[in-house]
Amino acid sequence: MVGTPLFSNAKKILLLGSGELGKEVIIEAQRFGVECIAVDSYENAPAMQVAHKYHIIDMKDAGALRAVIEKEKPDLIVPEIEAINTDTLKEMESEGYHVVPTANATKLTMDREGIRRLAFEKLGLRTAKYEFAENLEELKEAVTRIGIPCIIKPIMSSSGKGQSTIKSESDIKTAWNYAKSAARGIGTKVIVEEFIKFDYEITLLTARTAEGTRFCEPIGHIQVDGDYHESWQPHPMCAPTKAKAQEMAKKITDELGGYGIFGVELFVLDDEVIFSEVSPRPHDTGMVTMVTQKMSEFEIHARAILGLPVNVDIVSPGASHVIKSEILKWAPEYEIHEASKVKDTKIRLFGKPIAKVGRRMGVALAVSDDVIKAREHAEKVAHLVKIK
């Protein structure tokens, strides 16, 4: 049951992190009459622009986080980013607050060490070989054991920040410094991963609901510098490999528990499926579902956490392509007239208050009778949008 927003009987969601994904979650939750409060570390974040109210705090600060939760007394606490004090979330959950999907799942998936150890050491899922390092000397030793080439990532970061590929020993120090500069949270620990020459990588959106687990069609995607660049749905997979992917996704999401959508990232090499990462919330590559599915990943997430039924049916092949800034500017302007002329496409601008070089400012979406055409159209639209 839901009440009326801004009245005493309102059902309240407190969103921790107010980026473009959270913005869409709030829009979907508001369609069901849910009162939405957005929280982030800076003013005018995308989700704040559509929320009933917002707060600006450092979410890594235990006292500040506890204070805003106790002030708002939400029915659901919905994390959207990694930079959150997860120990405080566990405390609040023990005091009766509901963290989506669970506080433990949030804590485990916020750092690559926790989720990698869970996937490989506890559940026995196939992963890339990995080591952890807390200083430069340990990193050099780990690289020697893993072998070159290999991947270096902070154990806590987002959107590919801090990620490097080691191609020779001379790259190690630069990679270490870059990882430290981009790390979110406390400490400087990094993960060293085996470089896998996979055939392709997918996101398998996995919805845990009161009615059971549902899988969206696989989403293919390409990353540039470790960050999502374009995605498409469906990505073709043979039935046995798809079944392996679903089995792996169910195993990891069942262990994490709770309700909501999970973005499970997987590599595929020949007919083998290799676990990469999992996010207990909507995934950036899943923005394509805004045009490909009956219900977008955002609607599915909102419905699942509210205990409502979901539909994962696909209605059309489609694609997404990021719109990135090439300039640094406060309150940028967008030329979208030419881009809006392209048939069967949509533009979603996120409303970020400042444009930075390489920052994701929007996404172009396209549908077609096949994903190849959709990818071409989405890329065309993305490049037609001019940020000034």
Swiss-Prot record:
PROSITE patterns for the chain: ATP_GRASP
What species is given as this protein's source? Methanococcus maripaludis (strain DSM 14266 / JCM 13030 / NBRC 101832 / S2 / LL)
- Its quaternary structure? Homodimer.
Q: What's this protein's name?
A: Formate-dependent phosphoribosylglycinamide formyltransferase
Tell whether Nucleotide-binding is among the UniProt keywords.
yes
Q: What is its EC number?
A: 6.3.1.21
Name the keywords, alphabetized.
ATP-binding, Ligase, Magnesium, Metal-binding, Nucleotide-binding, Purine biosynthesis
- Its top-level enzyme class, in one word, is ligase
Ranges where the ATP-grasp domain occurs: 117-306
Residues binding N(1)-(5-phospho-beta-D-ribosyl)glycinamide: 20-21, 80, 284, 352, 359-360
Under the heading InterPro entries, the entry gives:
ATP-grasp (IPR011761), ATP-grasp_carboxylate-amine (IPR003135), ATP_grasp_subdomain_1 (IPR013815), PreATP-grasp_dom_sf (IPR016185), PurT (IPR005862), PurT/PurK_preATP-grasp (IPR054350), PurT_C (IPR048740), Rudment_hybrid_motif (IPR011054)
